[in-house]
Amino acid sequence: MISIITPAFNEAANLRSLHTRIVDAMTKLGVTWEWIVIDDHSRDETFAVLQQLSAGDPRVRGVRLARNSGSHVAIACGMHLAAGDAVIMMAGDLQDPPETIGAMLDRWSRGAQVVWAVRRSRPGDRSHASLAAIYYWIVRRVVGLRDMPATGADFFLADRRVVDAFRAFPERTTSVFNQLTWIGFRQEYVEYDKQPRAAGASGWTLARKIRLVIDSVTAFSNAPLRWCAYIGAGMLVVALALAVAGVALLPELGGGILLVLAVLFGVSGVQMLALATVGEYVWSALAEARRRPQYVIEVSTAETGDLAGTVNTVK
């Protein structure tokens, strides 16, 4: 069986069309499948649509989270619930065409354990594409996950062994895609053309993008801490040079107080930046140490085994 999981936030206008296309694609492939949609506490009729789809198609399962937790938490929830031999994650906005699933399953049948659908083209404004390019450069060069596709990938297939390994991860403040890249196994790629959003607006705000960058770096890399050490060492060298210059030259020059203030503000700024960097790591460690549940399920469309109130557990 193939499990398809979809995080959804205010996607009521897209889910019926996506369901139709998934049914068509999977019927042509002739495989058994289930579709698990995780409603990330939407403000529209997303869960009502899921109830209707589930009533007409028992392969559809809707789960509503008790609070808005972000797409990566919703994806993790879906991977915890999926029962398939392979799990496919695709967006709910029709930007990831279900017709690509056939190529992904072909790679899986030939031994690939993670299959990334890599974008050949990306619709949307250039600013969004530029931010995405910067993020994936950071992931590859700073975080050190060089197997991450340069153009990024958020449409993937994971084998059951990979999913089981992912479930053992205790981290809460990180990226599912980064975890799957780090986890290893045999990873391959297929290309596709990302489609324009069919309806609605993306909930992927600039603030969430920045948060994802910070979480990705603090979860996988100590590079910022080393940068702080290098900058601090460099500033000590500069301070020593300024002290020597001050003793030798400033009695003959005016404006010495301005130089002192400039150095003071510069040093203070670097200290605050270093403190903030360390603080991010401390906060990330504290968030993990609390061991709060990553998500809580408010209600499910499942006819048996109601999941209401279910939380994920970490062994």
Segments from the language model and where they lie:
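Short conserved micro-motifs on helix faces and helix-strand junctions that flank
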Residues: 7, 65-67, 156, 229, ...
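A general structural signal marking secondary-structure boundaries and capping sites
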Residues: 26, 112, 142, 146, ...
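Structured helix-beta-strand junction loops
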Residues: 56, 84-85, 110-111, 169, ...
